[in-house]
């Protein structure tokens, strides 16, 4: 079982995720024809991308597979492949490896006769495959009780001014979401109108770590605005905030849990 992927698509993925983590977990769902890429950033922050299987990302297998990919190592070695390469990614779960391979054929004029010259490249990278696991992505898309749009640069500017605090209070009033620093002295408050806000949600208040919001800084060059949802599970437990956007050719999600 392996994934065949165009090098341009692989470059996008590793360039993006290597800014946040040295490795990611890849989950291929052959039934839904989707590939999920997941990384845990710490502090109850999870990031994942959803990529449809297609001509540029093709899965050679019938069963679902989960494995780890060392994106930082992959990013460093992609210069070994031709710019038009299609790369096979094959995990070796038993030996804690992942293999990248590709070939390229060019025609060379040899005594006025075109001769095909084939170049094969194979790179084996070590990575602990025992830690890979299936992440329940659907849990965070089951229910939404609030929705707004947040301009990333403005949010980052706001939290830069309140770096002396550890968390923000999250409240809901008159179909608005309010982010506020603790206390009434030297207090900062940011308010967003919401396109969707359940009446039940406006009875609650939460806390979110500023260190979690700071992890959005890595998106600054790629994202202008995030669709932001307050998500719940099937038992109506409010889980946290889900930031979503489409980056280049794939959808990206960042989930931040509310603090207890």
Curated annotation (Swiss-Prot):
The keyword Transcription applies. Pfam families: Pox_TAP. GO terms for molecular function: identical protein binding. Induction: Expressed in the intermediate phase of the viral replicative cycle. The keyword Transcription regulation applies. It comes from the Viruses. GO terms for biological process: DNA-templated viral transcription; regulation of DNA-templated transcription. Keywords: Activator, Transcription, Transcription regulation. Associates with RNA polymerase to initiate transcription from late gene promoters. Belongs to the chordopoxvirinae VLTF-1 family. Interacts with the late transcription factors VLTF-2 and VLTF-3. Interacts with the late transcription elongation factor H5/VLTF-4. Interacts with itself. This is Late transcription factor 1.
């Amino acid at each position: 079982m392996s994934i065949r992927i165009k090098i341009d698509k692989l470059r996008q993925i590793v360039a993006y995720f290597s800014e946040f983590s040295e490795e990611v977990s890849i989950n291929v769902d052959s039934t839904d024809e989707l590939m999920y890429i997941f990384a845990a950033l710490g502090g109850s922050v999870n990031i994942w991308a959803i990529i449809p299987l297609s001509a540029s990302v093709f899965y050679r297998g019938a069963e679902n597979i989960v494995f780890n990919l060392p994106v930082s190592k992959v990013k460093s070695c992609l210069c070994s492949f031709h710019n038009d390469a299609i790369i096979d990614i094959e995990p070796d779960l038993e030996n804690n490896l992942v293999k990248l391979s590709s070939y390229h054929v060019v025609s060379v004029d040899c005594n006025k006769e075109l001769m095909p010259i084939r170049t094969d490249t194979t790179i084996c990278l070590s990575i602990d495959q025992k830690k890979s696991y299936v992440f329940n992505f659907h849990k965070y898309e089951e229910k939404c009780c609030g929705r707004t749009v947040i301009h990333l640069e403005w949010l980052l500017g706001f939290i830069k001014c309140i770096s002396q605090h550890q968390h923000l209070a999250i409240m809901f009033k008159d179909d608005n979401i309010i982010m506020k620093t603790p206390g009434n002295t030297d207090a900062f408050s940011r308010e967003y109108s919401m396109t969707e806000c359940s009446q039940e949600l406006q009875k609650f208040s939460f806390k979110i770590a500023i260190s979690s919001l700071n992890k959005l800084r890595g998106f600054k060059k790629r994202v202008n605005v995030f669709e932001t949802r307050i998500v719940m599970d099937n038992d109506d437990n409010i889980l946290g905030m889900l930031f979503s956007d489409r980056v280049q050719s794939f959808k990206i999600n960042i989930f931040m849990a509310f603090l207890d």
